[in-house]
Amino acid sequence: MGPKKKKISGNGQSQKLNKQIHITPVRPGLNDHLPFVSICTPTFNRRPFWEMAIKCFDEYDYPKDRMEWIIVDDGTDKVEDLVSHIPQVKYHKYDEQMMLGKKRNLMHAKTRGDIIIYQDDDDYYPPDRVSHAVQTLTANPTALCAGSSIVFVYFKHITQMYRFGPYGPNHATAGTFAFRRELLRQTRYDDNKAIGEERDFLKGYTIPFVQLDPMKTILVFPHIHNSCDKRELLVYAPNPTCNPDPDINVNTILRNESIYQFFMKDIDDILQNYPPGDPKYKVEVNKQVAVVKEANTKRMEEHRKKKQEEAQRADTNKIVDDANKRVQEERGKAIRVMVQNKKLLIKLREYEKLLGIEPEHAFTEEHVV
């Protein structure tokens, strides 16, 4: 049976859906020794992204019989029809629009996995996303959480890949998280947080942590329906944690042709014709975004001012150092002249004696210094 088409609610365009079977045929019990994994995805009016998200899930190389996919949907354009055919999916829909922190806590309560791994609905995740995270946590038994403090972000408007991070050994953005169930006995998200929720969950980045390979974890494509316009991150670039990376291109991480087509060519027109995804409908989220933006702007302005003052001090110090250097050079020259003059004075006195010149007519140091 060929792929079916489904209308995109709100824009009248059609979108092909991935209807293949998400079951890996294996002998019963063959993979029981592997940790059971709960994939968690919160979503709000992101219908255009779900074909891509499903393909990412389908391409994971971790055994599907050791996975479940928890989806919490509080959007007005529910995606139940797009995911209900997937055996691993546990879909939960809510009419109440929630903050991201509350949605993540709610997802956790629905999971049964030994390891919980995040898959955001609008980012690309490589096939080894799950297996790499599981292997890394297994190899680091003291770590409760894994993630990547380095994230690659491709900005189409300037055709440039940027490397963000690293920010610290215990830091990562939530979209890269993978953690043991044990962690949920120690922490939870702030229900009222919609942005920057990671800091609370990781207790100020003090949770025992291990870093993941960013190339095996996530690739981010900014788009017009982001709650925060990621292009604004470039205002103060380059800086120590935000730099272009000419050695990494999209194909280095993303090798699925149809997903590449979606992100590189199709996405802009699709989102322009999908009004439900407009960030203006996230009223409470936007309030928090505005507060964070203001704080970030103030912080970056203080950083800029500090750098400017440091540069001015450096310039002043250089001027003083150069002046001191010139003074020392001139002093050295003067001393050398004085030494030479004294030598000449001694010679002159010797000649004076030979010539019988009277002392009152002789040269003195005052004549030559």
Regions found by a protein language model. Name each.
Residues 1-58, 330:
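N-proximal low-complexity "stem/linker" segments adjacent to membrane-targeting elements
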